[in-house]
Amino acid sequence: MKLSVQKIQLTLAISFLTLINLTLLSYTQVQAQLGNSKGQLNQSLIFAAPPPPPDIGEPGKRAEAGSRGCGGDMNKPLTSSQKRLTALVPVYSKSELVFAATTAEYPSFSFYVPYSSDFAYGEFVLEDEAQNQTIYKTSLAGAPGVVNLRLPSKAAPLEIGKRYRWYFNIYCKKDNQIIADVEGYVRREQLNSALKSQLEKATPNQRVSLYAANGIWYEALRAASELRRTNGQDTSWAALLQTVGLNDFATEPKVECCNLESQQ
């Protein structure tokens, strides 16, 4: 009788240990699947560019093509970087149109700036469809890197359905001449209720993917930038830039500057 009880106890102990091992194995598999899902989300991230407006005459310019001197010295380099001033925005390959959408009243515009504040300063210009311009001046950082220029909340907000043209010019401090410039277009879109509901329930990584899949570039880039700031191991920033051919800038540091000051 005692032997039977011992056998039952042994059987129960083995069953209990087996259950624990299966539970741990299952948990490990789920964790691995979640990890793979996050990695797959970034690797398969797709930016679905909206149809380009048919009535734009000048396509814009995403990157500065050449190098211009400062203060009359055409051979003086302003930076040791080999990269040029570049707007971190999509460009349509067939038309070379620089155009992207936002849902924000006051979006942020991101640029790679290879110049330092020792030599140069910046000017950001926003022009509406009636060609009314708002001109902002900004200082630059002390070193090359990615800068974010956010429209100040005291300015007139972007209107839904309206298209705006923007210019970002870099001036030489010595002679106040433009040494580099980029330009493009932005249109503010209405955020539909279905997407808004999805975004409210989404994780930070999923928000990047949702914005990108719906062609909302500026918010996708801002969400990816925030992930990069809070988690240096996250790959959303690099993956998003790669979708529009800007992977060369994925590892460039973000530099803290710059405030836009209205000149009007």
Please report, for each region that a protein language model flagged, where it lies by residue.
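C-terminal segment of classical bacterial N-terminal signal peptides
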Residues: 19-29
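Preference for solvent-exposed, low-hydrophobicity sequence contexts
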Residues: 236-264
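Extracytoplasmic/surface-exposed domains of secreted proteins
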Residues: 109-111, 146-174, 178-180, 184
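Bacterial N-terminal signal peptides that target proteins for export
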Residues: 2-16
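Extended, polar beta-sheet/loop recognition surfaces of beta-rich domains
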Residues: 41-57, 61-71, 76, 94, ...
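Solvent-exposed loop/turn segments flanking beta-strands in beta-repeat/beta-sandwich domains
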Residues: 114-124, 128-130
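Solvent-exposed serine/threonine-rich low-complexity stretches and specific carbohydrate-binding patches
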Residues: 133-145
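Contiguous beta-strand segments within globular domains
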Residues: 96-112, 117
